[in-house]
Amino acid sequence: MNSKIRHIHMVGIGGAGMSGIAEVLLNLKYEISGSDMSDSAVVRHLRSLGARIAVGHAAENVGDVQVLVKSTAISDDNPELVEARKRNIAIIPRAEMLAELMRLRQGIAIAGTHGKTTTTSLTASIFDEAGLDPTVIIGGRLNVYGANAHLGHGEYLIAEADESDGSFLCLLPIINVVTNVDEDHLDHYKTREAINSAFVQFMNNVPFYGLNIVCGDDPGVLELLPQVKRPVLTYGFAEDNALRAVPLESGRISRFQVWLHDEKLGEVSLPQPGRHNILNALASIGAAMEVGISFEKCAAGLCGFKGVGRRFEFKGEKQGVTVVDDYGHHPAEIAATLATARQVFEGRRIVAAFQPHRFSRTEAHFGEFCKVFNNVDQLLLTEIYAASENPIPGVSGQSLAQGIRQVSSTPVEYFQTLDDLARALPDILQEGDVLLTLGAGNITRLGPTWLEGLDHA
C-alpha cells in the first residue's frame, strides 16, 4: 500500500479472519478503527494493540479513513458501508486486504472446505522451527503466538484462504494447499459446480513456477485435477500419492512414516490425534519442503506443535468428566472429530453438545446432520447459531432434533438456549464421560461454564 493509506476501518473486525489481518496491520503501524457486534476477548485484544473499536454498527463509526474492509458476514445495507459509499471511500473484502499483505511477501495459501486452520498452523510451526519467522494469518488462536496472527520478519506469509464467498480468488500465492473440496457455503455458490469452478480457478492462479499441494485421497479434489493447468503434488494415505503417510500409532499422539515417491523420509510424532490431522501434517510438510526446509526440520516443527484453539482442544477435567471443544460445524468435520474422540477415549461415554451454525448450512445438509451423530452415546442439541442470517421457515434446532430421532437410535435432547443446556448438564454428565462441544458459534462457552460450576453460558 502506498503512503496515501494511513487509516483503515474494518467492519466485523472481531471475526476470525478479520482480526488476524487487523493485528498484522496494527503491527505495521497503520491506524486501525473498526466495529463489531460484540465486545469479545478478540476485540479487547485488538484495542490493547491500539485499535479503536465500537460495539455495534453506525454511520458515525466511519471517521477520516481511506479504505473500509468488510467481513464476509457484513451485508451491503450495513450503515457503515452505506456511509462509506456516500463519501466515495473504497470498500474492499477482507481477502483483498490479505492479498495486499501477501503481495509484499512470498505467499502460501491454505484452502479447503475443512482443515484450513490446523494446516496453516502446522505449516507455521515448521517454518518457525526452520528459523524463517513467517508472517501468519489464520482463523483460530495459535497457542504458540497467543493470537491468530503474527508479523514475522521473514519473506513468507502463510495464510488461511477462506473460500466461503469466493474472495480467496483475490490471492496470488506461490504455493497453494487444498485440503479437500466439499459442498458448503451454498448460500453464496448455489451449486456444487460453482464451488468446483472456484477451486479450479484458485489452483490455476499460482504462477507457472508455483505448486498446488492437494489431498489425493479426497474425491472432490481428484475430480478437479484434470482442469488444473499448474504443477500439482498429491498427498494422502493412498499409495498413488506422491507424498504419503503410513500410520504407526494412534491415540493422543499420531505417529507415522512419511514417504516421497519411493523414498522413506522418516517418522513424525504429532501431538494431535486423528487421521485427518495426519493429512493436515502431510500438507504442511509438502509446503515446507517445496521452499527447501529439510524433512528433519519438518518433523521437529510438527513434534513441537502447540496446538490451535477450538481444534479438539482439551479444556479440562472435573468429577471424572473430560471436556473437549471443537470448531467442527459441517457433517464431514463432525464425523472426523467423532472418530477421533472414539479413538482417543476408547470405551468411554461420549456426550456431544452441538450447536448448528447458520440456517442455510443446516438446511443444505439436513440429512447428513441427522445421521452423523450415530456413534455418540448422547446428543445435546441447541438452537441454530444464526451468524447474521435470517431464519428459514421449518429449519431450526428443534426440527433437526426431530429429524435425528427419526433415523438414529442416539438419545437426543433439545435445548432452546445455551443457558438451558448449561443448567441441565449436572444432571446429564456422569463420571467417566467425555463432554465434546461442537460448533462454530458460542457453544465454546459451555465447557468452561460447567468446569467453573456456573449455571449460565
UniProtKB/Swiss-Prot annotation:
InterPro entries, per database record: Mur-like_cat_sf, Mur_ligase_C, Mur_ligase_C_dom_sf, Mur_ligase_cen, Mur_ligase_N, MurCDEF_pg_biosynth, UDP-N-AcMur_Ala_ligase_MurC
Keywords: ATP-binding, Cell cycle, Cell division, Cell shape, Cell wall biogenesis/degradation, Cytoplasm, Ligase, Nucleotide-binding, Peptidoglycan synthesis
Enzyme superclass (EC): ligase
Residues holding ATP: G112, T113, H114, G115, K116, T117, T118
EC number: 6.3.2.8
Highest taxon above the source species: Bacteria
Pathway where it operates: Cell wall biogenesis; peptidoglycan biosynthesis
Catalytic activity reported: UDP-N-acetyl-alpha-D-muramate + L-alanine + ATP = UDP-N-acetyl-alpha-D-muramoyl-L-alanine + ADP + phosphate + H(+)
Any single GO CC term annotated in Swiss-Prot or TrEMBL for this entry: cytoplasm
Gene Ontology molecular function: any one: UDP-N-acetylmuramate-L-alanine ligase activity
Keyword Cytoplasm part of the UniProt annotation: yes
Subcellular locations according to the entry: Cytoplasm
Single Gene Ontology BP annotation: cell division
Keyword RNA-binding carried by entry: no
Purpose: Cell wall formation.
Family named by the database record: Belongs to the MurCDEF family.
Entry-linked HAMAP family: MurC (MF_00046)
The protein, known as: UDP-N-acetylmuramate--L-alanine ligase
Organism this protein belongs to: Desulfovibrio desulfuricans (strain ATCC 27774 / DSM 6949 / MB)
Gene from which the chain derives: murC
